[in-house]
Amino acid sequence: MDSGLQQLALCLFFILCRLFQATAEDDWKIATATLSRDRDGSSSVATGGACGYGDLRQSSFAGYSAGLSGKLFNRGSSCGACLEVRCVNHIRWCLQGSPSVVVTATDFCPPNSGLSSDYGGWCNFPKEHLELSHAAFTGIAETRAEMIPIQYRRVKCGRRGGLRFSLSGSSHFFQVLISNVGLDGEVVGVKVKGHTTAWIPMARNWGQNWHSSLDLIGQSLSFEVTLKGGKTIASYDVAPPYWRFGMTYQGKQFHS
C-alpha cells in the first residue's frame, strides 16, 4: 500500500473512532438532581411512592431509588426503569472523578408552581429532574449540596430472582403489582390467565399496578409481561389455585 492510501486509511480510522466516541457520549442526557428529604429536612429513603413498590429496603436495588419529574415519569410508565447517574461540572459538590450510581425509578417528583423551576421548583414541567435516595445521592455528591447538575442514561436492570407478582383486590377487582423486572425494567403490557380462561389483557391502574374486573379466585394464575423494548415473557401457573390476596409469587425473569 502506498503512503497516500496509508494516510487515507489512517484518517478514516480516526474519524470512525471519533464518531464512535461521540455516539457513546450522546447516550448521556443533562438533568439536575436533589436529595430526597422528609418534611423535617432529614434525608430519607423513599418507601414506594407513586410506583407502588412498598418498602424499598426490601427490594433488590438496596435503596438506590429516584423520584422522577413529570417529563421523565411519563404517567407511571417509567416505573422500574434503571438509570445510571453521575454528578458533573461542579467542583464543590461533585465527588472526585465523577463516579456513577445506578438507580431505579420508584416515585413521582411533583411540581411546585409557586416556585421558580430554577430555585425550588426543580420538578416543574418540562424540567428533567431526579430526586435521589440518600444512598444514591451520597454516592455521587456531597450531602450538603442542595441541587446538583447531573448526566443520566438508561441502562439494563440487573435483578436477582424472578419477576414478582403481588396480588390485591376483591372478588370483582383483581390487581397485581409487578416488580423486580430485569432488562429495561419498564412494563408496558400485562395479561393474566386463569386455568379456565384465555389470556386477558390488564390495564395500568397506577405505577406498576395492573388491574382487571375479573373473579379469578380459586384458579391458578399465569402472567404474560411485555417490556418497552418489545420483549415478552410468560410465567405459567405462578400462583396456585389456593392463592390469597396480599401474597407475592415469583415468575420467570427477563435476560439479555
Curated annotation (Swiss-Prot):
PROSITE patterns: EXPANSIN_CBD (PS50843), EXPANSIN_EG45 (PS50842). It is a peripheral membrane protein. GO terms for cellular component: extracellular region; membrane. Residues 1-24 form the signal peptide. Residues 172-251 form the Expansin-like CBD domain. Keywords: Cell wall, Cell wall biogenesis/degradation, Membrane, Secreted, Signal. GO terms for biological process: plant-type cell wall loosening; syncytium formation. Residues 48-162 form the Expansin-like EG45 domain. Coiled coil: none annotated. It comes from the Eukaryota. It is found in: Secreted, Cell wall; Membrane. InterPro entries: Expan_Lol_pI, Expansin, Expansin/allergen_DPBB_dom, Expansin_CBD, Expansin_CBD_sf, RlpA-like_DPBB, RlpA-like_sf. SMART domains: DPBB_1 (SM00837). Causes loosening and extension of plant cell walls by disrupting non-covalent bonding between cellulose microfibrils and matrix glucans. No enzymatic activity has been found. Belongs to the expansin family. Expansin A subfamily. This is Expansin-A20. It comes from Arabidopsis thaliana (Mouse-ear cress).
